[in-house]
A protein has these predicted regions:
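N-terminal metal-binding scaffold of metallo-dependent hydrolase/deaminase domains
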Residues: 1-31, 41-42
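Divalent metal-coordination and catalytic microenvironments
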Residues: 14, 20, 39, 50, ...
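Histidine-centered catalytic micro-motifs
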Residues: 44-56, 218-227
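Active-site gating loops and adjacent loop-to-helix segments of metal-dependent hydrolytic enzymes
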Residues: 57-91, 122, 150-170, 227-252, ...
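Alpha-helical scaffold segments that flank or form the walls of functional sites
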Residues: 61-140, 170-185
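Metal-coordinating catalytic core of metallo-dependent amide/deamination hydrolases
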Residues: 119-261
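His/Asp/Glu-enriched, well-ordered alpha-helical/loop segment
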Residues: 247-254, 296-383
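C-terminal cap of metal-dependent C-N hydrolases
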Residues: 373-417
């Protein structure tokens, strides 16, 4: 069976070319040749829109709270302790573990939002460690090179934050060019990032965004994950972070806002109208106690959604998609919050995890059609957890009833990983 963007269909065939792309898709009778026969259901590889691979090391480390309940900020303290001890070898080890696990769960592409570096701005060892890890794992990576300059709006970096410092926009752009020149050009590309309005001045965000548009690169930014970010921005600028970006023209179709947990409906409507996308990380937002995003408003105004594993406490994107819907059901006491025009939630979630992720990372992937990247996943549709589902039910059964354990084969760029 083959996913066609709306359902799984039997007796379909696809041909791959020598450049890692899909050459043709059709029925068994339409395409000639003696193809390899594969038993199972094939779909586009899942696309992880937002990852901090090194945070894989925090599993279990930040889950003890004593007499005081934790928060995003107490978790951040644990993350800073990790940052202080991170060297290139450890960064490679953690990144490789994250990427290998993603591959096992059917993720073929990842947006790696990397912001840790050595004190010397010319030292690229940690960037290199992440890139080598992705190459070793065989995963497609968009290296989201991050600008990070302040500890909060108008405040200097402190402590472990010194390892995030990009010094200036000019230095950031030199770093971006240097990293781009070192990539595996076939499986790795770059995107641009301003960490957040807390970590980059609005003037520099405007400049970075302008360069991203000129170069045709994705532009990612954390937006309104926690209430304190909004309060800080309102105190400094008299408006929310999202409104600040809108007022300064930093919203175009290449912009992806990460989280939007506490975004105001009117801000979100204007943001989507300007072409902005949203990447949600429901497992991380649940782990950190951030809150629940207003997905109905996003859907109502036609937002392009994707998902990411963020802190990588879990790297199973099927579980991430399941959480995306289930958290909304719990919050609203209703079922079927995220559905397509036919009222099907499984199919819509699968599109978010594939087509939506491809849009967020600027990849020609996430679909099975001629010309698209041959990043594919085969899973066992006769697995005990899926055997009762027919073709029309299979997407929902996969999202809500299975895990990465049903994945039997992962193909990236036309090659088995």
């Amino acid at each position: 069976m083959l996913w066609d963007g709306t359902r799984f269909q039997r007796d379909r065939r696809l041909l791959l070319d020598d450049d890692g792309r899909i050459a043709a898709v059709g029925s068994v009778s339409e395409l000639e040749g003696d193809p390899e026969r594969m038993h199972g259901a094939m779909m586009p590889g899942l696309i992880n829109g937002h990852s901090h691979a090194f945070q894989f090391a925090l599993r279990g480390r930040a889950e003890r709270f004593g007499l005081v309940q934790g928060s995003f900020w107490s978790w951040r303290d644990a993350m800073y302790d990790l940052v202080d001890s991170l060297d290139a070898d450890r960064c490679h080890e953690l990144s490789l573990a994250s990427f290998n696990e993603m591959i096992d769960h059917g993720v073929t592409s990842v947006g790696e939002f990397h912001y840790v570096r050595h004190d010397d701005a010319q030292d690229h060892r940690l960037d290199d460690a992440v890139m080598v890890a992705a190459e070793d794992a065989g995963i497609r990576m968009v290296k989201l090179v991050t600008c990070y300059q302040t500890g909060d709006i108008g405040k200097p970096l402190e402590g472990a934050q010194a390892r995030f410092d990009t010094v200036s926009v000019d230095e950031y752009l030199r770093r971006l060019d240097a990293i781009q020149s070192r990539l595996d050009g076939h499986l790795q590309t770059v995107g641009m990032v301003a960490h957040s309005v807390r970590a980059v001045s609005i003037e520099d965000i405007v400049r970075l965004h302008r360069v991203s548009v000129e170069r045709g690169l994705p532009f990612h930014i954390h937006v309104e994950e926690v209430l304190e970010e909004i309060e800080s921005c309102q105190a400094a600028h008299g408006c929310t972070p999202m409104r600040l970006l809108l007022d300064r023209g930093v919203v175009t179709p290449n912009v992806v806002a990460i989280h939007c947990t506490h975004s105001q409906p009117e801000d979100m409507r204007d943001y989507v109208a300007a072409g902005g996308q949203v990447c949600l990380c429901p497992i991380t937002e649940g782990n950190l106690g951030d809150g629940i995003a207003d997905i109905p408003v996003m859907r109502e105004c036609g937002a392009s959604l994707s998902v990411g594993t963020d802190l990588n406490s879990r790297t199973d994107l099927l579980e991430e998609l399941r959480w995306l819907e289930y958290v909304q059901r719990v919050a609203r006491q209703k079922r079927g919050v995220i559905v397509d025009a036919d009222g099907d939630t499984g199919r819509e979630l699968l599109r978010i995890g594939t087509e939506g992720g491809a849009r967020a990372l600027g990849l020609d992937a996430g679909r099975i059609e001629a010309g698209a990247l041959a990043d594919l996943v085969l899973f066992d549709h006769e697995h005990d957890s899926l055997a009762a589902a027919d073709e029309d039910e299979l997407a929902a059964a996969l999202i809500f009833g299975a895990s990465g354990s049903v994945i039997s084969r992962v193909i990236v760029d036309g090659v088995d990983t």
